[in-house]
Amino acid sequence: MGRKWNNIKDKKASKDANTSRIYAKFGREIYVAAKQGEPDPESNQALKVVLERAKTYSVPKSIIDRAIEKAKGGSEENYDELRYEGFGPNGSMIIVDTLTNNVNRTAADVRAAFNKNGGNMGVNGSVAYMFDATAVIGLEGKTADEVLEILMEADVDARDILEEEDSVIIYAEPDQFHAVQEALKAAGTTEFTVAELTMLAQNDVELSEEAQAQFEKLIDALEDLDDVQQVYHNVDLGE
């Protein structure tokens, strides 16, 4: 298993403080999911996933409703989902997921962020094979043993269940994202601290202080791009 989820989350805290950027990214993602399928999350699994993730970031209902209404209204605005892969300092690996209405602009922006910050773009597949698509669900108020028992009784599989700080974090296959939550809800859980579909590195690397400083600049440059939705990497940033 890769880095503990709470360590990843802690390092994102300063970024997450920029709520307007977070909300804008979710608004775009909700719009795309609603436009590609039904605007009802009960009949649109992709939309349901995004809404469950948005809840853990406290995205306001007004932003969610506006994005869904925009999709219902037949907006002609179209977005492509594109993934870029690349390398940072000392062979560190990075995956960048984007939603874009201008592929050429996004490709140029992502390439520039890599090139200006000690990295370089790779070809498709050059990095992703070192990561596993993973559902990550977090909750408070139960022990890992209690969660394991709940999931076993519901016949839901998990890769790993870990106690991290005050939370229990469940790592599962992506197709178990809803099943894990439904089993826990049936056992009384009403709120999740984490609900993510992510890419977890199979192995982490540690960088020197100088290389890590440059790496963090690269990650910041990528995350600051409007078209970038998610950035995944294999660097252990420490505490």
UniProtKB/Swiss-Prot annotation:
Major location category of this protein: cytoplasm
GO cellular component annotations of the record: cytosol
Places the protein is found: Cytoplasm
Superkingdom of the source species: Bacteria
Keyword presence, RNA-binding: no
GO MF term set: DNA binding
Keywords, sorted A to Z: Cytoplasm, DNA-binding, Transcription, Transcription regulation
UniProt xrefs under InterPro entries: Integrase-like_N, TACO1_YebC-like_2nd/3rd_dom, TACO1_YebC_N, Transcrip_reg_TACO1-like, Transcrip_reg_TACO1-like_dom3, Transcrip_reg_TACO1_YeeN, YebC-like
BP GO terms, sorted: regulation of DNA-templated transcription
Entry keyword annotation includes S-adenosyl-L-methionine: no
Pfam hit, one: TACO1_YebC_N
Record-stated family: Belongs to the TACO1 family. YeeN subfamily.
HAMAP family, per the entry: Transcrip_reg_TACO1, Transcrip_reg_TACO1_YeeN
The protein's name: Probable transcriptional regulatory protein Bcer98_0465
